[in-house]
Amino acid sequence: MSHIRVAFAPLDTNPSTCGLETFATQIETLSQMMTAEEMKAELYDCVRRILREQKFDQIRENEAMLRLYKVMGRSSTNLKGRGIYEQLFKKDHFTGSLKFYLQWAEECGKDQMLEEFKDVLKLARDRLSERIEMTAIESGFRDLVDEYFNGESGDMFTRPDETMDLFRFNAGSKKKRRSSVCFLQHNVPINNSGKAAFGPKTKTDLRQACIDRPNYHGISIEEFRFAKWKDTFGEDVDDDYRKRKDSGVVFVKHQVIDTDRQAREEVENRFNANLNPRRRHLSPVSEKTVDDEEEKRSRIYSPLVATKDAHRPALRSKIENPPATVTLSSDTKSASEKDVSDSDDADDDERLKIMTAGRKDGNPPDRSTSISSNYSTASARTSKSGAGLDLMAENKCLEAHAMFSDTVHLASEKTMVLGDDSVFVPERSLATTQIVTDFSVLCDPDPTMTITQERPKKVSNGLNVVYDEAAEPEESQKVEESEVQPEIVLVSPVTQTSPATMFNDIYDDEIEFGFFKPSRGNFVTSTPAQGVHLVNIDEYFGNKEEESTHEQEAPVFVAPTSSTFSKLTRRKSLAANQAVQPSVTESSKPERSDPKDSSIDCLTANLGRRLSIGADEIPNLTENNESEITGCKIRRRSEIIKQGDINPWDETLRKKLMCLVRPPQNMHEFQERAPKIQALRDCEVSGEKLHIQTLIGQGGYAKVYRAVTDDQRTVAVKYEVPSCSWEVYICDQMRNRLKDRGLELMAKCCIMEVMDAYVYSTASLLVNQYHEYGTLLEYANNMKDPNWHITCFLITQMARVVKEVHASKIIHGDIKPDNFMITRKIDDKWGKDALMSNDSFVIKIIDWGRAIDMMPLKNQRFKGRAGTEAFDCPEMVDGRSWTYQADYFGFAATMAVVVAGKYAQLTGASVGDYSLNVDIKRRNILRDACYDVINRFLNIPSCDSLPDWNILIKSFSEIWNEKFEASGWRQAVSKFNEACDLAANQK
């Protein structure tokens, strides 16, 4: 007797449902051990008996028989699986079974018969809709579509009774989590009046309606509170709600609190379990602001200890001997009353002799006995005013300020003519005052000296003069003066207008009220800047009327009467001033170069709202003889930047660029002080009241609050001190340039929009759109193991956005995870084509305070470091020229955070060896593509051979199209949306 006969014998003896299920299980096992021909002969005979003999009538249409028919379909050569189910349907067998239709549809899916699949789905709807919910019917068919038809359902699952849902009470949304409170309310009966006995806005006595009824145990207030807690934190409802609960027991108050505390701890533990326990929670990177408290305390009792910048380890394994320096600066002010009275030319000569004697043997002299009392700490310094009043000043020198300061390095020659670094600075009083300054708090751990000098009164910091003793004498560098140095010349727009037309234009009605009124406020952005001169708002936005009024009184620096100081250095103004400076002959006047070969092109016609300013009205940004520091190779102040390099974040340069266009219409300027902003307080700006709710973000230069306007709109308010206008300008230009290229949707969805900007004399308020789902940094912290679908989706969108930013001739300059906002959830209806769709953007790039406008700075190169920890590109580290490389490196570092969930450190020492120490799991499909991007973006040979964004986008698109799985995509979307909800709940 065969194995099939042996298995069928018990069922033949006692036909029952249990026996049929046992027989079906044995047949499924034997089908894997026997050939199709052996199985076909024996099994068909058994099934034939079940269909014909009367004793099997009770089990003939049992769903266990479908298991036998499924095995028969595998061995059938004529009917196959689909034919068997068609015959069963004709005989009206299993027409009320959902499993029957699913198995039938599965056979259609295996044969890729989509139309027959739809017919089976229609039959299932027609036969089962009266007994089974439509969502339950379609759920199984949806899985089959994902498995056999790659998720291309089209309108297959459009419910025929969608219109009826409009009239249903509380129909709910698909895939919505069950509410614990709703389950509890469902158990409460409805009273005779037809109103709910329990819930909001009801007056029913809870105990009488819910608890004290015969044969019913209702919910207690403790259970209701616990259910609401679980709803708040996304917990699923308990299925054992029908069990007996001690609802009538009244607990004391402290027991209720203990219960709530246990529930809170349980929920928090569950959420913490979703985070990756092997990595730390990432925090936003920011620029260093002030030295830490421990280091400041150490310098209080030991003033000669070098500052933090001097001890910072080099990012590359390279040994350099720093040159010995003597620093002369006007940035720090600290002196005693004795220094003011006793510092004269004789003391200066004596100090000069000591300094010179120290240089002869290469060692600086010991100053511990002579000037130890003149040192001040980094945290507080004393400055003598003209009236002899001691003023305590907080040290606001930031680390990044030291990298981008107006510092000029002198060679062995002690005199050097310096150019005026305040081209746009308004006229100041020419009166001089004696200031005794101490320089012990500068970065270089070298001996310093105190010197008395005369200089004009200025609110802003003056020019730093750093004497490099290891530098070559100036005479030896005169050979290089014959080389043509790049001169920055700004070519005006093609349309030229007369000065009269210009003055009429600036009072055009399109300009918001408040412009061109005197105001005294410093304009800086999130980019660190030291030595920022005082600029009023009229000059900042290009008001030439005020400038022409005083054009005969240009600011000058008068050389001090001290003969010793004149030996070291002197400074004169670039502007001609007959009252102070001696007349200059025609032969000695420097000639301006012809701007036809300028390295800076003019703004094109689509730059935006421009002012009519002639080229002859815009002075050069820098002169050939002016050296400027924009950074350093290993973060030392004494690094020399060659002539011709410019600081892309220089305020003078930024003002000049903003003079070429009209101010944005959403900019409002006031000359009074900015109002104070505090959480849970109302703030009124320009007649509009903002209800400040809470602080949602804070950086080194600004705070961001969530607020509600009078029309109940939730907005984000960025409060920055001092006031900043560059970010408003660059966002306006970025959006206009995208719109000019036909990318209106990207400009709306992906670029930060400043709804209103209020610029006061002391601070600025930027009102932006509020996004509750957080940033990519919060997403990386909330995701334990992100699915590659979401990672590929986000990386591709980031690349598409940054590509268009660069195509608009703008460098963002500060690309990092916390500068990408998540604007919305991913729609679960999006399919395979969502990757490259213009309607599926979910990220927006923000924080444009460090952006660089390259349209008027065509073919320019920059040197120096930005100062953002872990986001300085290799070109900044090496001291090489860079442009868009800053964004390429920021993109690679951001991609590493999204993929691996942690910050990556820069490794390598030369071009070709640079990489990021990011660990991407081997099972990650994007592993090779990510490593390739890191290698190409970190090892860029020069500014003329930048990587192509299209190659990156194409690479990730090919992986997406080849490996895409509809079911995996939906699961990834669900996790992404859960992370968005978690970020929204944390705010």
From Swiss-Prot:
Which residues does the annotation say bind ATP?
696-704, 718
Q: Which reaction does it catalyse?
A: L-seryl-[protein] + ATP = O-phospho-L-seryl-[protein] + ADP + H(+); L-threonyl-[protein] + ATP = O-phospho-L-threonyl-[protein] + ADP + H(+)
CDD domains under this entry?
A: STKc_Bub1_BubR1 (cd13981)
The lineage is: Eukaryota, Metazoa, Ecdysozoa, Nematoda, Chromadorea
Its Enzyme Commission number(s) read: 2.7.11.1
Report the protein name in the record: Mitotic checkpoint serine/threonine-protein kinase bub-1
Keyword annotations: ATP-binding, Cell cycle, Cell division, Centromere, Chromosome, Cytoplasm, Developmental protein, Kinase, Kinetochore, Meiosis, Mitosis, Nucleotide-binding, Nucleus, Serine/threonine-protein kinase, Transferase
Region of interest (Disordered), ranges: 278-385, 574-599
Instruction: Give the superkingdom in one word.
Output: Eukaryota
Gene Ontology cellular-component terms for this entry are: bub1-bub3 complex; cell cortex; kinetochore; nucleus; outer kinetochore
Null mutant phenotype: Embryonic lethal. RNAi-mediated knockdown in oocytes results in aberrant homologous chromosome segregation during meiosis due to severe pre-anaphase spindle defects characterized by disorganized microtubule bundles. Delays in the processes leading up to exit from mitosis including delayed activation of separase, which results in a delay in the separation of sister chromatids, delayed cytokinesis onset and delayed chromosome decondensation.
Q: Where is the active site?
A: 814 (proton acceptor)
What effect on the protein does mutating residue 718 to R have, as reported in its record? No effect on embryo viability, severe loss of mdf-1 recruitment to unattached kinetochores and probably loss of kinase activity
Species in which this protein is naturally found = Caenorhabditis elegans
Q: Does the keyword Acetylation apply?
A: no
What does the subunit comment say?
Interacts (via kinase domain) with mdf-1 (via coiled coil domain); the interaction recruits mdf-1 to unattached kinetochores during mitosis and between homologous chromosomes in early anaphase of meiosis I. May interact with bub-3; for localization at the kinetochore and the onset of anaphase.
* Biased composition regions of type Basic and acidic residues, renumbered to the chain: 350-364, 588-599
